[in-house]
């Protein structure tokens, strides 16, 4: 059972995959989107789903530190609805608070990457952290 993890932003979607057993997550790529113009990268996402034989998707929810939901949470849920309707896959959500901060810290401290290089990979690494946190807590897709 391979899952995808998505870190959905207004300009990019970071994509990560689980191993077939659902133990570990690894980043795949960043899909460029343009939320304002209604370009959501679903064609590319569909290619990944098909190539990787994905059975479910986990989408990060960027909740506020006080656990309230802001406009980006709504945008992530809307993206999940679009993905579910288009591909017929179960969707679940994972709290993603601080995953981008953690990804940035990892890239600075452990990989010693420049700011320009970090910007190119941070979203897919955040997606990896979202999916890994989900796998560690739930193990398999629980929603859908």
Curated annotation (Swiss-Prot):
It comes from the Bacteria. SUPFAM superfamilies: Ribonuclease H-like (SSF53098). InterPro entries: RNaseH-like_sf, YqgF, YqgF/RNaseH-like_dom, YqgF/RNaseH-like_dom_sf. Could be a nuclease involved in processing of the 5'-end of pre-16S rRNA. GO terms for molecular function: nuclease activity. The keyword 4Fe-4S does not apply. It holds the Pfam family RuvX. The keyword Endoplasmic reticulum does not apply. Its EC number is 3.1.-.-. Belongs to the YqgF nuclease family. Gene3D superfamilies: YqgF/RNase H-like domain (3.30.420.140). It comes from Oenococcus oeni (strain ATCC BAA-331 / PSU-1). This is Putative pre-16S rRNA nuclease. Keywords: Cytoplasm, Hydrolase, Nuclease, Ribosome biogenesis. GO terms for cellular component: cytosol. Transmembrane segments: none annotated. It is found in: Cytoplasm. It is an enzyme of class 3 (hydrolase). The lineage of its organism: Bacteria, Bacillati, Bacillota, Bacilli, Lactobacillales. GO terms for biological process: rRNA 5'-end processing.
């Amino acid at each position: 059972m391979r899952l995808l993890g998505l870190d959905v932003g207004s300009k990019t979607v970071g994509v990560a995959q689980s191993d077939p057993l659902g133990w570990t997550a690894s980043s795949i790529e960043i899909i460029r989107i343009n939320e304002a113009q209604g370009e959501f990268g679903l064609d590319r996402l569909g290619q990944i789903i098909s190539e990787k034989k994905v059975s479910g998707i986990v989408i990060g929810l960027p909740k506020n530190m006080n656990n309230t939901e802001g406009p980006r949470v709504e945008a992530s849920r809307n993206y999940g609805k679009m993905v579910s309707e288009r591909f017929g896959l179960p969707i679940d959500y994972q709290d993603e608070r601080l995953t981008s901060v953690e990804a940035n810290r990892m890239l600075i401290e452990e990989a010693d990457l420049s700011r320009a290089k970090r910007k190119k990979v941070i979203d897919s690494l955040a997606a990896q952290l979202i999916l890994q946190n989900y796998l560690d807590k739930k193990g398999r897709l629980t929603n859908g």
